[in-house]
């Protein structure tokens, strides 16, 4: 059977792939999908406090606190080459609170935590993995964003901190894509909207979601692998839905 390659000649099936947040709902589904679909890939997945439940000879687990600059620097220094980095880590609610319904609920600490998890890690990954990504024939850096981070698409309001952190993430990715035209001309930077998935992150907010609009993470992961396999320089700097449609920034 012929090896699957993209337009650059990269053997996708044997790619070196890093999945950040690989023990989460979407992240763990993506790890499983990549191992199944790309039978020769070498996969590295990170977890925050508890490791993933999957054991596989081509899967390497790494504990990583994405809020800590030093940990990301140390993690990145262990890689000679990386083809894909997919950041699936995200924060919507936790001990510091949840999405605000109105401005009266706004809290600076909650906004800071959203930015520390939803925005800054992608910039640190781009910075510290730059050399390893440059050695790929077709590097991809993609982060799971959210439609609520689209300024043009914001019609409902609310959720100040989450929206702000995702909008900032989108700006970071768009800006990085412009730099990559010169520094990584064979590469692609992408923001990914996963839709609403049946995960711990979205579970408190699923009551108003139609069953047909609530996705199994395995479905989203399959769509993401389809999309990632088609990304290249001509598609860099865009905001994609799980099914390959463009969203406005």
Regions found by a protein language model. Name each.
Residues 19-20, 87-88, 139-146, 188-191:
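Structural signature of the Rossmann-like NAD(P)-dependent dehydrogenase/reductase core
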Residues 20-35:
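N-terminal Rossmann NAD(P)H-binding glycine-rich loop of SDR-like oxidoreductase domains
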Residues 32, 123, 167-178, 187, ...:
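Conserved active-site helix of classical SDR/Rossmann-fold NAD(P)-dependent CH-OH oxidoreductases
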Residues 35-55:
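Conserved glycine-rich Rossmann-like NAD(P)H-binding loop of the short-chain dehydrogenase/reductase
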Residues 64-81:
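Conserved Rossmann-fold cofactor-binding substructure of NAD(P)-dependent oxidoreductases
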Residues 91-95, 99-115, 134-183:
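Catalytic loop of short-chain dehydrogenase/reductase
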Residues 187, 191, 199, 203-249:
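C-terminal helical subdomain
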